């Protein structure tokens, strides 16, 4: 149909400068910068409806800095920071209605710290803590009505201590004890 698919710059036969791509229908698809053949700087993508889809930064062809994504309806979907291509710092995700779904902390691409999830109503769903990508300490989950579902403890990624399950009405369903991942 004669529609331009992409426009890019080259220097000595190597991609250098801004590159723009379009959907077949003519809407802009992406815009990114290159330095001597490598992604460098801001990269932006769009949904077919013209809404922004993602924004991220690159340094020497490696993701570095904040990455933000959006749903087709324009609502923010996620925010995550990167350092040298690895997740670093707070990671947050939202549902299509703008309600927070999850939040956690990453260190060197591994979950490290508190991680929380929520139901679409805003009610807390679960809470747990990680140390170097392994569960550590208390882990709990709640029913949608706010009543606790279960609570358990971890040490170096293994169940350790008391684990309790509750019914939706608050009555205890079962209790177990664990040591080093084994039921005692």
Feature annotation, model-predicted:
Residues 1-184:
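Glycine/tyrosine- and acidic-biased, solvent-exposed loop/turn segments at the edges of beta-strands
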